[in-house]
Amino acid sequence: MGAHHPALGLLLLLLCPAQVFSQSCVWYGECGIATGDKRYNCKYSGPPKPLPKDGYDLVQELCPGLFFDNVSLCCDIQQLQTLKSNLQLPLQFLSRCPSCFYNLMTLFCELTCSPHQSQFLNVTATEDYFDPKTQENKTNVKELEYFVGQSFANAMYNACRDVEAPSSNEKALGLLCGRDARACNATNWIEYMFNKDNGQAPFTIIPVFSDLSILGMEPMRNATKGCNESVDEVTGPCSCQDCSIVCGPKPQPPPPPMPWRIWGLDAMYVIMWVTYVAFLFVFFGALLAVWCHRRRYFVSEYTPIDSNIAFSVNSSDKGEASCCDPLGAAFDDCLRRMFTKWGAFCVRNPTCIIFFSLAFITVCSSGLVFVQVTTNPVELWSAPHSQARLEKEYFDKHFGPFFRTEQLIIQAPNTSVHIYEPYPAGADVPFGPPLNKEILHQVLDLQIAIESITASYNNETVTLQDICVAPLSPYNKNCTIMSVLNYFQNSHAVLDSQVGDDFYIYADYHTHFLYCVRAPASLNDTSLLHGPCLGTFGGPVFPWLVLGGYDDQNYNNATALVITFPVNNYYNDTERLQRAWAWEKEFISFVKNYKNPNLTISFTAERSIEDELNRESNSDVFTVIISYVVMFLYISLALGHIQSCSRLLVDSKISLGIAGILIVLSSVACSLGIFSYMGMPLTLIVIEVIPFLVLAVGVDNIFILVQTYQRDERLQEETLDQQLGRILGEVAPTMFLSSFSETSAFFFGALSSMPAVHTFSLFAGMAVLIDFLLQITCFVSLLGLDIKRQEKNHLDILCCVRGADDGQGSHASESYLFRFFKNYFAPLLLKDWLRPIVVAVFVGVLSFSVAVVNKVDIGLDQSLSMPNDSYVIDYFKSLAQYLHSGPPVYFVLEEGYNYSSRKGQNMVCGGMGCDNDSLVQQIFNAAELDTYTRVGFAPSSWIDDYFDWVSPQSSCCRLYNVTHQFCNASVMDPTCVRCRPLTPEGKQRPQGKEFMKFLPMFLSDNPNPKCGKGGHAAYGSAVNIVGDDTYIGATYFMTYHTILKTSADYTDAMKKARLIASNITETMRSKGSDYRVFPYSVFYVFYEQYLTIIDDTIFNLSVSLGSIFLVTLVVLGCELWSAVIMCITIAMILVNMFGVMWLWGISLNAVSLVNLVMSCGISVEFCSHITRAFTMSTKGSRVSRAEEALAHMGSSVFSGITLTKFGGIVVLAFAKSQIFEIFYFRMYLAMVLLGATHGLIFLPVLLSYIGPSVNKAKRHTTYERYRGTERERLLNF
């Protein structure tokens, strides 16, 4: 038997520890001070000790799994209190998912108090300690190993990895793991929590992960709860937002629309190509058929084409008048008689007419005294009752206007990338040029200098402190500065801080930066520096807002720093707003003059765009003036009809041209004055565009009137007033047609809700109407006076000086341009072989334009609105190149919603027990599809953070037990007690009056290391509490858009945000809540127009064309087909304008839409005169009538509009403003060239083919009127 004793002894030694481990401790109680107020635990190897009964509540709160039998534990009450204190930060972020926090508490409860500690804890370092209170020698536990089951660690991590931190828009583990949430895993998370360098652990705990026994140690493998499981009967599983497996399949975006293709090619190209070829086939086939048919009837091809043989496209119009012909003839005769009498009256009574005209002009233009010019971009681009404008007003009223932004984007072009080598080991980390410490010091100097800028307003000094956003004021008056330097508390000393020795640097600004970009809301980093990341203003500084040019989320690779100074905006408080303007002016001046060869700075202030728009308008005044001078000179010289050098100063009409121009400008002034009387403000687009438009319309009428007189012979026995009356009777109807068509088109265009189009249309319509009235009154009288001067041989301008009498006198003659049109251009254009070519070319161009009309870009590049030399252009470029986050977007829930009921809470919140289709959850789901929805991050949710804050397990919500006033978590006062009891009822969410009782406390609580959930900084402005803190008004839930670079991006972001909000609203309504959710971002008011720009364009152009059609139909005396042909031609011009816009890179927006509406009006000038001349012609065939119309009206249209406008437009090409060069020079040039070619080439050809038949009643009336006079011979041309 003795031989077996050694083996038996060894077996007993192996078995005995197992028996000891079953109920054995490694520590009990607290001993010496470790760091700060943290203590070591006392080493103890005995059995667990019964917990005093006054600690029962605490163990039930923290470790209910250990509350059994006589509650014998390996910890005392002080250790439990320390555990509670150390777990406050994880509690605040993880308690929203009970199963996650349950597993975490299991890990720490087993570590701190488990009666089986010795199974999985192994003390590896101790030191002696003398307790001065008990006068006993004890042993501090300085280090130990914690054997944790790998499966337990993985299960705990899996339950927590999806938990959100609503106030910081990121995963909670990103704040608790010491690294980015994406890099966090089960092992490095637990290692971080047990590392004494994290600021919470008093000593080092080395976790050892294994599911198998190691060296006789049994890993802690307690049961865990999945995030989709309930912890107890009171709490439910975690929400979808905090537990992805609860959500089911991840939502998928709808597939992008497939491009419309036919045979692998763009469908529009194919369709229009096929259509064009088919048209050519039909058109030329019809011509060939007619030609062959005519060959059967004509003896020779030289037989006159103006025969009435059947099927002739040029057949003459014989036969009886139709039923509408007499009506048209009567109406035309009525107009002719009325204008004839009026013209004669004006010539006979020039003094009276001119006096009343001047009086009218004076009265109307005096309204300019009350003129208001709108430069506010919101007023310019957003309709007062548009959805975006109303939502902006609602947001501003309830939460205050969105803050003013002063922003700098800084690069370090002369600095290279440097490499940081972490201690003691790890991969090298590259740091971008601007993250060089010397550069950071220089940027900090700049930032401090900007903070020191002062301005003067009303003899008061204005500083940044006076106007900045300070969310924790008055407790913390530091301004919000979104800058990477806020990670270093905006301090040179903190930036230079480092921990190391003579050989190594253990921690410096690199380590602090790497931690803070992962946990921007942290109050204590994990390095030896232990510095806060939270900004000095009390809020987090998110890396995507202060860094630019990095890849993915590697913030250390940043190539740009972004510094933003949010400044308070004010709702209906002009006085305080002017203070901000004054400071911004000094800010702009300072940064413009700042010199540092190591830094490249792009910047903007809130007022920058408005300032630059004003500067742009002023800088291009000279260009616009030159443009008008060129047109004035041309008009003044071209009106004269010089017959000989000796009569140069007599026959010139410079004074008449100047008078005509002044009449045009007076009509503009009258229009501005009339609407200024009404209190309607002007816009820059009105001032810049309308004179151009009215000059085109007015000059054309002047040329028609003057040139008709110059070609006219005075009849026998006819006086001057009778002659001018007769001439006005002939041409005034066509002037009336064009002017009234344009006036109607513009006034109907004012139905548009777009402010730019609405205002322009009203002012333009009134200006054109007044211009017409002044031309048939004042100008006719002036023309009569000028003719009398000419007949008396007096010099132009110097009208009192009589010229030499050469005996020639003035007589009617044809100008060179008229003879060119009559003898060469018109006959050539209407040749049988050329007309088909003209039709083919113009229809081809039309087909191309239709094919590309859907490819015109929509929007307005912001940089185009700035002068070429503007500093804001550099800012826009840097914005697109470097920034990685878009503007903030607020989902606003309108006032009246019931947050105090469980049902109401569930429809909004995103935590445990909340609906899977709640407001927060739907925004969270949208952020998961950020490339589609353009929502970049999960929303910050005040209600979820409030529930965590008010939870009885948290140390955040406490009251003084005597006064019942709020007690901040940082206050160490034994009279402070938790707000709600630690009972099953207390653990439930507050409802009813209790919900409102603690909410104001939450919104006024500043975050601190003991409670990071204080809502003052994050939610102080997010919740309206009204009715003396009795109920909640409007609230918002904020997130950020993804980076937006183009107009299409901005428009799509707004569209998707509205879709999300609409879905939330519909979901709430389906559950009985009739309150609306809408999104708001600062740019919505500017980009809303692009959501409907296509519909607005179709509406405005259709209304304009429709009104032109109706006026033309009436004025031409029910000539239906003439009105149709004219509108077809104008429509072709408009479609071709879209083709030019696509070719020339002109986008569709409010500015280009105004120009399109204007081009519709100017097209009338090119088409209406020739169309009416065609209908009035009594020639025998369509070709002859088209030739006569083109010869007589073409020269006036060409000289009156085309040449006048062309000279002025060319000058605009030299404008400094990009918006002038693109939207005015390019579009004006296009509309003049397209109008001229269609009006002078295509329209006559079209009329020669399908023009209306001659009005028999008009022909009869005309013959009867001129029978027996010398004008009878002119009827046959």
Swiss-Prot record:
Found in which tissues?
Detected in liver (at protein level). Ubiquitous. Detected in adult heart, spleen, lung, liver, skeletal muscle, kidney, testis.
Q: Where is this site: Important for cholesterol binding?
A: 108
List of glycosylated residues: 70, 122, 137, 185, 222, 228, 414, 459, 478, 524, 868, 898, 916, 961, 968, 1063
Residues bound to cholesterol: 41, 79
Kinase found in the keyword field: no
Assigned keywords, A-Z: Cholesterol metabolism, Disulfide bond, Endosome, Glycoprotein, Lipid metabolism, Lipid transport, Lysosome, Membrane, Signal, Steroid metabolism, Sterol metabolism, Transmembrane, Transmembrane helix, Transport
PROSITE patterns xrefs? SSD
Q: Where is this region: Required for location in lysosomes?
A: 1274-1277
Region Important for cholesterol binding and cholesterol transfer from NPC1 to liposomes: start and end of each range? 175-205
Q: Which NCBIfam families match?
A: 2A060601 (TIGR00917)
| Official protein name in the record | NPC intracellular cholesterol transporter 1
